[in-house]
Curated annotation (Swiss-Prot):
Residues 1-21 form the signal peptide. The record marks R49, H50, R87, H88 as: Cleavage. Keywords: Cleavage on pair of basic residues, Hormone, Secreted, Signal. This is Pro-glucagon. Residues 80-85 form a propeptide. The keyword rRNA-binding does not apply. Its main location: secreted. It comes from Carassius auratus (Goldfish).
Length: 121
């Protein structure tokens, strides 16, 4: 226990001796100017603003990519669920076939009238 006390006393003595050897800087003898301090401080704010801008830019890119992915998923889901485009195409095809069959029936009827054959029952 006494050895630990001697060691603590020795460390305290070394600390005090080093403190006395280093002279304190006087306010008037300081070589650093106010302008130098301000210039050094601006570097920190620039770095902070740069990091905030970088984060904002990266986050905006992420959100834009996410919106694009959501839009593509929405398009794929609407196409696979039979969206309005598919029904429109089917309706157009059915309408075209119906008009073709009506035209052909009318042509057959006119041809039958021209032939003058009696009605078959």
């Amino acid at each position: 226990m006494k050895g630990a006390q001697y060691l603590a006393g020795l460390l305290l003595l070394l600390f005090v001796q080093n403190s006395i050897c280093v002279p304190l800087q006087d306010y008037h003898t300081s070589t650093e100017t106010v302008e130098g301090l301000l210039a050094r401080g601006q570097g920190f704010t620039t770095a902070k603003r740069h990091s905030e801008g970088t984060f904002s830019n990266d986050y905006s890119k992420y959100l834009e990519t996410r919106r694009a992915q959501d839009f593509v998923e929405w398009l794929m889901n609407s196409k696979s669920n039979g969206g309005s485009a598919k029904r429109h195409a089917e309706g157009t095809y059915t309408s075209d076939i119906s008009s073709f069959l009506r035209d052909q029936a009318a042509q057959n009827f006119v041809a039958w009238l021209k032939s003058g054959q009696p009605k078959q029952e």
